[in-house]
């Protein structure tokens, strides 16, 4: 066995024992904390119980990791020469252009909607009104507008706008 192979195999064993060690430590301290709160057993009994629980948790975590490596081997194998990326540098060069502003600016446009399209319903008498069947719904009006906006933008600008929206909602 070559020195490089031995070093790689030791690193693989160390990496494979990281999760079981964390699980065992967490189980040990959780058991000790539970015994301290309960105060119904002697200290050496609590430590022995915590040690057995930690060994069981570590063996279980190691077995689950080995089973996962057997079932989905690509999940835990690192590609040769590639290190995991610690962070992603996200740079947005997209500046909001004036073309995305509303076409009318501050100009108010008159609408042709009137209350003549409302007809009285028979159930509520004079107080109840409903829209006539020929009036398009709010969803119909807005879906056309949103669809046009999304298809008019290039792919990169849509992605930049989506990323900005997500980042602004997180803060």
UniProtKB/Swiss-Prot annotation:
Keywords: Cell membrane, Membrane, Transmembrane, Transmembrane helix. This is Uncharacterized protein TP_0708. It is a multi-pass membrane protein. The chain crosses the membrane at residues 13-35, 50-72. The keyword Cell membrane applies. It comes from Treponema pallidum (strain Nichols). GO terms for cellular component: plasma membrane. It is found in: Cell membrane.
């Amino acid at each position: 066995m070559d020195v490089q192979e031995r070093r790689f195999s030791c690193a693989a064993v160390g990496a494979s024992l990281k999760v079981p060690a964390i699980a065992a430590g967490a189980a040990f301290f959780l058991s000790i904390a539970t015994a301290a709160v309960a105060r119904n057993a002697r200290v050496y009994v609590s430590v022995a119980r915590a040690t057995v629980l930690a060994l069981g948790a570590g063996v279980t975590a190691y077995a689950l990791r080995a089973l996962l490596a057997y079932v989905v081997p690509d999940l835990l194998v690192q590609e040769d020469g590639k290190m995991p990326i610690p962070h992603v540098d996200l740079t947005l060069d997209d500046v909001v252009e004036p073309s995305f502003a509303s076409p009318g600016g501050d100009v108010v446009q008159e609408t042709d909607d009137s209350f003549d399209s409302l007809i009285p319903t028979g159930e509520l008498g004079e107080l109840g009104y409903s829209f006539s069947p020929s009036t398009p719904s709010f969803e119909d009006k807005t879906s056309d507008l949103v669809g046009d906006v999304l298809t008019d933008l290039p792919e990169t600008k849509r992605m930049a706008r989506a990323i900005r929206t997500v980042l602004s909602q997180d803060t």
